[in-house]
Amino acid sequence: MANIKKGDLVQVITGRSQARGGDRGKQGRVIEVLVEKNRVIVEGVNFVTKHVRVGQTQRGTKTGGIETHEASIHVSNVALVDPETKKPTRVGFRTETVTKDGVAKTVRVRYAKKSGKDL
């Protein structure tokens, strides 16, 4: 089970400060998790400009130009935001026994280490 999943609210904890044009301290939702590369794409963070070559679509409209979109950021540079305190926290795992239809099942649950609340 991963510490950070798609849809989690995270905060950038390293990098340039916002006063110098960086992203440190910004919060955003995780759009995508790149498991093989240990990277995440966060909404509204780490924008890059990409120059796209002019081409044509099936309808004949021109495409291309300068586009901006979010680039990936390493998972060690972000921290999950605690839903209770709205501050960055570490993620812990605990096993809980759930009984459903008379069958006991062991489930791993993520929780915020600062508040102890389930995620």
From Swiss-Prot:
Say if the entry is tagged with keyword Zinc-finger. Answer: no
InterPro entries in the record, alphabetically?
Rib_uL2_dom2, Ribosomal_uL24, Ribosomal_uL24_KOW, Translation_prot_SH3-like_sf
Q: How does it assemble?
A: Part of the 50S ribosomal subunit.
Q: Mind telling me which Pfam families this protein's record contains? A: ribosomal_L24
Q: Which NCBIfam families match?
A: rplX_bact
Q: Which GO terms describe its biological process?
A: translation
Q: Which PANTHER family match?
A: MITOCHONDRIAL RIBOSOMAL PROTEIN L24 (PTHR12903)
According to UniProt, the name of this protein is Large ribosomal subunit protein uL24
Give a GO cellular-component term: ribonucleoprotein complex
User: In the UniProt record, what gene is named as encoding this protein?
Assistant: rplX
Q: What family is it from? A: Belongs to the universal ribosomal protein uL24 family.
Question: What molecular function does GO assign, one term?
Answer: structural constituent of ribosome
Fetch the CDD domains from UniProt. KOW_RPL26
Q: What is the stated purpose of this protein?
A: One of two assembly initiator proteins, it binds directly to the 5'-end of the 23S rRNA, where it nucleates assembly of the 50S subunit. One of the proteins that surrounds the polypeptide exit tunnel on the outside of the subunit.
The entry's keywords? Ribonucleoprotein, Ribosomal protein, RNA-binding, rRNA-binding
